[in-house]
Structures are given as structure tokens and as C-alpha cells.
Amino acid sequence: MILPARTPETSLLRVLFLGLSTLAAFSLAQMELHVPPGLNKLEAVEGEEVVLPAWYTMAREESSSHPWEAPFLIWFLEQEGKEPKQVLSYFKGSLSNKPGVTLVHSISTRNVSLRLDALQEGDSGTYRCSVNAYDSDGKNIGHSIKTIELKVLVPPAPPSCSFQGVPYVGTNVTLNCKSPRSKPTAQYQWERLAPSSQVFFGPALDTVRGSLKLTNISTAMSGVYVCKAQNRVGFAQCNVTLDVMTGSKAAVVAGAVVGTFVGLVLIAGLVLLYQRRSKTLEELANDIKEDAIAPRTLPWTKGSDTISKNGTLSSVTSARALRPPKAAPPRPGTFTPTPSVSSQALSSPRLPRTDGPPPQAVSLTPGGVSSSTLNRMGAVPVMVPAQSQAGSLV
């Protein structure tokens, strides 16, 4: 490659080119964002507000912007493990911002400070401010970026107090205190209120865990114990009452607890028994009931049957024997006996006695008809079982 010979004119052009390049680079780097020294890391309390201070300047120019200057401003929030998110942007009079995020000053003053209202713990992170300046022709005349780290502190939430162990004389009891939320982590302090005021220290007190160990307690250690959880931005407290019992008092309390437990068990048992009984009665009411077996009926004997029971003989006539035989029509004025059937044999009626010889007994059938008459009529004597007054056969 052949290089042209260096002449004074060529050297001058080279110097001019390098100078213009330097001026162009300086013009792009003439914008600068500023953050006050020591304010690039801020801390604020949850629920309050904070201002992230920042402004930009143009080299060798006044602090106020020119009419032809058009800044493009963006504030980002960067959090660990999350994508950056835009919280505010401004360009040519158009402002877009999240709720609770505003600019402190007008953009024409080149002050781009950011205000955050009603802070929450989730607002912690690194805020990045980016400013690009354009001229009236839309040419970029400067760009700068600054970051501010914000840490939102949380005062301790009200803690909860409790104790472990049975507080009677000679035993050990541990008092516990814990706040569910605190940033930074809360430190704990225990003290006993008047009339026997006392502040506790290690090794009985664990300021990180919030526990206080009381050993070989006595009745003099009874009282109200207060736990205070605190950090750099606030504190909260709770209390617990310790009533040290003697042996007899402890026995009474234990008996009351056991009695209560037994009573609850008995009540539960009665309720279950009542429910089971009600269920059983309901099932019985819904069952289909069968009728009782009817008593057996004895068949009537036929006219020709003869039954002897316990030596009792009775005479009955069957339906066949009761049929009158075919005979000549009765004479006028003659009585025709009608046979009757009875389930019991009737004794012959006794006639009044006279001085004459005793009358001969006449065997009559029930209804006043003699057996001889029935025999002439064709009746057949049969034996049937007799029936007692209770309805049973004899």
C-alpha cells in the first residue's frame, strides 16, 4: 500500500478532523446526571414517603433547559430475581407513572427527582434513572444513567407472649416472645413490672429468640412480665401474667382440669347413647310387623265318629241325623218333637217327689226329646270332647 506524502496541508486537515471528532464526542457526553453524595443508598420506613434526588446538566450551559431541548426520562425498579419494571416515564409533555410515584419538580428545571408515597416493603430495590436529551431536529445530544438503592424498613409487628411449663414452686418455666414481621430483625427484652420490678439479661435471656428461662421458681416470682420487640425504626410489646402456685394449689387446679375432662367425656357418652336409642326406636317404628299366629281350630267330628276324652261321654247329633225321616204326615193334634244339638249334655230334670213309688228316670236329650224318640228318628249317638269354661278341651 502506498501512502501519500505528508504535506503541511495534509497535517492540518488531520488535526482539524481529530478536533471535530473530539468535539462531537464531547457533545454527546456533555449531559450528566447527578446524585447528591451519600444519597445513592437510602433507607425509609414503611408507610412514609421518600424522595430519590437526581438532576442532569449540560456541559458549559445554564441549569435551565432550552426551548429546543426535549428530554426523554425513564425510572426503572430492579429487584433481585425479577425483571426490571418501569415506574415512571416522561417524553414531550406526556407523563406515565405508577400509583404513588410522581416527579418532585417540573422537567423544565432539569430536576428529575422521584417521590414515592406510602412505602411498602415491596418497594425496596435499585432505582435506575435514564435521561436522553434531543434537540429540535430529534438528534440525541446527551445520555446519562444513575442508580439509587432504596431499602424500606419495617417496624416490629405486635409480638405474641406465652410460657411453657406448669408454674408451681420448684419447677422451670420458659417465657416466649415472637414478632411475626420486622425488618431488620427485632431484638427482644424481658422485664417484670412493679411491685417487684426486674430487668433480665443473659444467659437466661435470649435477645434473638425472645425466650426467658426461669429456673426453680417461687411465689415471689409471680407477676406481670413484659416483652419488648424493637429495631432501629420502632418497637412493639406484649405481656404475660405468671402466677406461681404451691403444691396444694397445683393439685386443686389439676383436679379441676381432670374433673372437667371427665365431665365432658360423660356428657359425650350420654349424647351418643341418646342418639343410638333414638335411632333404634326409629328403626323399630319403620319395621313391617307380622300378625300373630291364629289359634288352631279343631275340626268338627263327623256324624259317625266317636271320640273319648278323659272318660267324658257326650252325645251329639250330626247334620245328617237331624234330617227328619220320610214319614206319613202327622195326625191333627199330635206333637212332633224337634231334635236339637247342644255342645254339652244336660241332666234330666227332676220331678217333684210324691208319696208314691219313685218315678222312673226318663232319658231326655237336650231340648226335651228322649233318646228313644231320637233312635226311632234315625239319630246316631257320637262322642265329642267336652269344653271347659276356660275354652280348653277336657
Curated annotation (Swiss-Prot):
Pfam families: Ig_3, V-set. Keywords: Cell adhesion, Cell junction, Cell membrane, Disulfide bond, Glycoprotein, Immunoglobulin domain, Intellectual disability, Membrane, Phosphoprotein, Repeat, Signal, Tight junction, Transmembrane, Transmembrane helix. Residues 1-29 form the signal peptide. Glycans are attached at N111, N172, N216, N239. Coiled coil: none annotated. This is Endothelial cell-selective adhesion molecule. GO terms for cellular component: adherens junction; bicellular tight junction; cell-cell junction; plasma membrane; protein-containing complex. Residues 37-146 form the Ig-like V-type domain. Residues 300-372 are annotated as: Disordered. Can mediate aggregation most likely through a homophilic molecular interaction. Residues 156-243 form the Ig-like C2-type domain. The modification Phosphoserine is found at S304, S340, S343, S348. InterPro entries: ESAM (IPR042757), Ig-like_dom (IPR007110), Ig-like_dom_sf (IPR036179), Ig-like_fold (IPR013783), Ig_sub (IPR003599), Ig_sub2 (IPR003598), Ig_V-set (IPR013106). Interacts with MAGI1. It is found in: Cell junction, Adherens junction; Cell junction, Tight junction; Cell membrane. The keyword Oxidoreductase does not apply. Disulfide bonds join C177-C227. Residues 30-251 are extracellular.
